[in-house]
A protein has these predicted regions:
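Copper-binding active sites and cupredoxin-like electron-transfer domains
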Residues: 1-254
Length: 254
């Protein structure tokens, strides 16, 4: 559920006054991403609940048209940097910066450090991007809460390479898609990956569907799928035992 301020539609969400309420199954427990530690809020968590298969949850806020400043306090204008004026001016709807969860990884900064285009997404060359690094184990159940608080009316899309999901989550006969289109201000999507995270460990790109303006302006990130090991098994056992113990306690003293 998207939270927005309606006191000043133009400026409040433009400067980040928004949030989300995620409604989980009854008696759900929230665990830190890769530790057996409970947390009440985070952009990544493991959710467990009685009678429900545990899942890894990611919350992504898509930003379109935000006002970002560089380290010197200057307004960033990615759409105008390196633009060929011979093709006309920049459309007003494409101005402003892009990103996820108030973080952005612009091509401009990466190419300034290492001017090799075919390595633009390489973590080995540039390090991991500033945008949320989503992590899961192979085959794990994954649900992405994707929200678009603002600010431009220009529609975007959400792409996750190497994975797909149901276009209509409640319809098992719905078509499978790997692109969620027609995302605009106020949009909320619950994306459960079919068969969970990929069985093949590695880095998978998530991004806007528009390479020009959006992706080059920083609207992309990495979904890292890792191989299951002894640490994963131990953590699962600890969570299962902890949930069982709490359930016994509540049933006894309820």
């Amino acid at each position: 559920m998207l939270l927005n301020s309606f006191g000043d539609l133009r400026n409040h969400r433009y400067h980040g006054l928004f949030g989300a309420i995620i409604i989980e199954p009854p008696a759900a427990q929230y665990y830190s991403n890769f530790f057996n530690r409970k947390e009440s809020f985070s952009e990544q968590a493991v959710i467990t609940a009685p009678g429900v298969k545990s899942f890894r949850e990611f919350v992504l806020f898509a930003h379109n048209g935000i006002r970002l400043l560089d380290k010197d306090g200057n307004l960033i204008k990615t759409s105008e940097q390196g633009e060929d004026t011979g093709h006309g001016g920049v459309d007003h709807e494409d101005t402003g910066e892009k990103g996820f969860n108030y973080r952005s990884e612009r091509f401009f900064n990466r190419l300034r450090r290492v001017p090799i285009v075919n390595r633009i997404f390489s973590s080995r060359t540039h390090g991991d991007p500033a945008t949320p690094l989503l992590k899961a184990y192979t085959g794990e159940r994954v649900i992405i809460r994707y929200l678009m608080p603002g600010d431009k009316p220009r529609n975007i899309s959400f792409v996750l390479h190497g994975h797909n999901w149901l276009a209509q989550p409640d319809d098992p006969f719905s078509r499978r898609i790997s692109v969620q289109g027609a995302v605009s201000a106020g949009g909320v999507y619950n994306i459960e990956l079919e068969n969970g995270a990929s069985e093949y460990p590695g880095d998978y790109l998530y991004r806007s569907g528009s390479l020009k303006w959006d992706v080059e302006s920083g609207m992309w990130g990495i979904f890292r799928v890792m191989k299951k090991g002894i640490g994963y098994c131990c953590t699962c056992v600890c969570r299962t035992f902890g949930n069982w113990w709490e359930r016994q306690w509540f049933e006894k003293y309820e």
